[in-house]
Amino acid sequence: MNKDKIIIKGARVNNLKNINVEIPRDQLVIMTGLSGSGKTSLAFDTIYAEGQRRYVESLSAYARQFLGGIEKPDVDSIDGLSPAIAIDQKTTSNNPRSTVGTVTEIFDYLRLLYARVGHAYCPTHHVLIESQTIKQMVDTIDQYEDGTKLQVLARMCRNQKGTHKDLFEQLVKDGFLRVKVDGEMRLLDEDIVLDKNKKHNIDVVVDRIIKKEGYRSRLADSLETGLKLTGGEVIVENLNEKTEKLFSQHLACPYCGFSVPKLEPRLFSFNNPLGACPDCKGIGVKNEVDNDLLIPDWSLSINQGGIRYFKTSVGTDRIEWQRFLVLCREYHIDLDKPLKDFSKKELDIILYGSDKPITYTLQSSSGNVSKTTKPIEGVKTLIQRRYEETTSSWSKEWYASFMAEHTCPTCQGKRLNEQVLSVQVGGLNISEFTDMSIEKALDFVQNLKLNETETNIARLIIKEIKDRLTFLNDVGLGYLTLSRRAGGLSGGEAQRIRLATQIGSRLTGVLYVLDEPSIGLHQRDNEKLIKTLCNMRDLGNSVIVVEHDEDTMRASDYIIDIGPGAGVHGGEVVAAGTPEEMMKNPNSITGKYLSGEYKIPVPKKRRKGSGLFVEVKGAKENNLKNINVKFPLGKFVCVTGVSGSGKSTLVNEILCKAMRAKLYHSKEKPGKHREILGLENVDKVIEVSQDPIGRTPRSNPVTYTGVFDDIRELFAKTPEAKMRGYDKGRFSFNVKGGRCEACQGDGVKRISMHFLPDVYVPCEECGGKRYNEETLQVTYKDKTIYDVLEMTIEDSLSFFDNLPRIRSKLQTIYDVGLGYIKLGQSATTLSGGEAQRVKLASELQKKATGKTVYILDEPTTGLHSHDVARLIEVLNRIVDQGDTVIVIEHNLDVIKVADHIIDLGLEGGDNGGTIVVSGTPEKVAACQKSHTGRFLKMVLE
C-alpha cells in the first residue's frame, strides 16, 4: 500500500475518460472544474464509493443485507485508500423530532447535566423544590372536602416492557389486592396477561380511604407503605374529581405541593412520554385549522362563500350547512356581512360553536326529518374532529388543506412538560438553554458558576458540551439554536453540522470527502471553515473537497482541475498541482480565474428598472425585526447578508409565498408580515430551484422543456409514420403503443440481488433503446427517435437547423451552458446546477411579460466561476426583457453585477433580521457597517 499517495488507475465512472490520478495523502486536496465535468464522479462515485465498498465487503453476508451493498465503481485499481467518510449536502433528517441539539448529541449531554446538577423551582411560588415529609403530604390532602374518596397508589413501574409476572406475584405475597395497569383497575387474584413487547405503567393500590375525622393517621401509614415500596414516590387519587396528585420525598413545593419526579436523563427528553408535553407529545407544534386557510378572503360574507369549507355547500341541503345556519340564526349572525367586520364574539361562535344546547330540526336529502337538542360545533371544531376521525386518505388530505402548524398552546413550543421545565441550571431551564444561539450558549457554559460538589459531578459533561458548541461555532454556525429543527436546515448547514461532529470525533488516518462545504456561507465566515478543514488535515487525515470557492482553493495544499469542459467534453485531468502551479498552468480555466487573468466584469452602468416596487411591510417571521423592504421591479436584485440573517425567511417564506397566495391562490401560509404592496405590478412568480426536474429515468431535458412534443410530432409527420398510421403518441415512452413494454420505456430493468446491491441491466427486448422494433423503423434524416435522444444538445442544433421552432428551444438549453448533455439524459443524472439551468432554459422559451418575478436561492451552488459567468448572462437576458430577478446569494461575482442589493444583518440569529443597507453595489460597498460591503469593496476596486 502506498503511504504518500492515493493512486487511481483507469477511472471510467460516468463521463470519466479512463483517467489516472495521483492524490497526495494527509493533505487538503480540492477537486474543481466546470459543472458536469466529472468532479463528483471522481470524488464521491469513485474514491468514496470504493472506500465504502471495501469496508462493507469486510462484513458478513448477513450484515451486508441490512447495510445494502455498494456496486464496485468502474475503475481498474485504487491504491493507498483509507477508510472513507462522506460529508455531503443531504439534509440531516425530516423527522420533526430531530433538532440541531439531538443531531449533534449536545442535547444528550444537556439531559445528563440537568439530571445531575439541576434544581427544580416551583413555577407558581418560585421557591426551590425540596423533598416533602409525610406530614406535609397529609397536610396537602387535608385541603380536600370531607367525604372525599381517596386512593393511595404506589408507582411500581413506568414505561417498561415485559409481562411483569414476577412483580404481580410479589405484590400478592405482600398482601395487596388491586393494581392499576395502563390506567385500568385490575384484581391481583385474576390472571393478568401483558404484551411483553409493549411499555406498561403499573401502580399498586396501597389503600382506599374516605376523608373524615381521624383519617390522618391511617393516611400517614398508607403513604409510608407506598413510599417504601417505590423508594420515595406515591400518588393520591381523588376519586370524586378523578384527579391525581404526585407526592415525593424527593422534590415538591411546600406551598402548593407542585411535585417533580426523581431527576434522571430520560425525564428531560421530549421523545420520552415522561418528559414530553402531554398535548403535542414532544413535537412543540400541533396541526390545527388555520383561520386564514379557512377564510382566504375576509372581505367576503358567509353567503358569498367566504368560509372555504362551505363554499360548495351554500344554497344546498347538506346537513352540515343546515346545522351551521341554525347556529347562525340562534346567535343572530348576519350571513351577508363581510367576515372582516365580525366581532370577536361572532367569530368565536362560527369557528368554535355554541356553549349551550340548541333545539333544531334537520331534513335529509331523502326527506327524513329529525329533531334534536344539543350544542352545535363551529366550522373549526368540525374540521378538526373530522380530520381526527376519518380513515379515508382522500378526506384526511381535504381536511388537512385547512390546517397549518401552530405552536402548541400547552408548552408554547418548548416540547417538554411543566415538571421538566421547572428544573434549572444557572438560572435557565433546558428549553431556554436550547433556544439560545450556539454562540450565546457557548458563552453561558464557559461562565457557568457551580458549587464545588456540582463542579466535580459536571466537569466532564460540561467539557463535552463546550467542545461540541465550539466546533459548531468554528464552522460558522454560531447563529443557529440547538432547538432548530434539523429538517429546516439548508444543505450547507447540515453538511457543516456533520463536519463539526466529525471534528469532535477526532479520528485520524481517515479519508474525508466533502461536497462544497462553503455553500450558504458568507465570506466573513469562510476563514473559520478553512481553518476547520486544515485542522482535520492536521489530525492526520486526507481531506478531499469538491469546491469552487477561490479562498478555499488558495488555502489548499493541492488542486485537481477536471475538464476541460462538461459532460462529454469533460472527464479528464486538465491540471494538477499546488495553487501557485495552477495559476501558471495555461490549460487550467480555474488557474486563470485564480490568477485574475479571467474575471467576470462589473457592469458599466446599473439598470434604472421600471420605477415600480413590491414592498413587504412589517416582516417579522423568525428573526426579522418588523422590517419594511422594497423590491424594485425590472432590475436584477440581490439579497445578501451573513448566514442566519433572515434572507431565506424574507424572500422564500414571506415574499414568494405571499405572491403565490395572491396570484395562484396557493394554500401555503406566508410568514408573518403586515401587508404587501405593489402586487398588481406582478402577474407571475417563478421559483427556479436546484431540485431535480424529475425523479424517474423517463424525465429528461426535452420532456421538461417541451421540445419532445415537437420532435414526436415531427416523427409522426414522416411518410413511414403516416403510412403506418402512427400519431405522435406512438413516439412517447410514457404510454403504451410505441414503447418497449418489457421495460415500460425505461431502457433498463432492475434485478433484485437480495443481500447484494440491485443491478440495473439494459433491457434484453429493446437493448436499452426504450422503444419497440416497429417504432424504431421510422426515421427522420436516417435517425430513429432513439438516435435523436442520444444526441447532445450541441449536435442536435445542426440536425434541426431547418426547423426553427425546435432549434430555438434547443438553442436556449445550449445558451445556458448545457450543450454537452444529451436530449434524453435521465433527470436523475443531472446535478442541481444543471437542473436549475434546464428550468431557466424552459423559462427563456416563454414570451416575456415584463411583470414576471424570478426567485433563485443561491443559484451558484455547484457552479465553477466559468459557469457563474454563463448564469449571469442568462439572468441578465431575463432582466433585459423587462422581468425581475431576485437572487439570494453570497457569491461576490453575482452580487457585484446586481442592479440593487438588499443587505440583511448585522449578524445571524437574534442579532440579525434588520436591513443594514439597501441600494446599488457601490452604495453597499461604501457602507462601513456592512459585512457584505467590506468584501464587495475589494472586487469593485
Residue spans for each PLM region:
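Conserved phosphate-binding elements of NTP-dependent enzyme cores
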Residues: 1-941
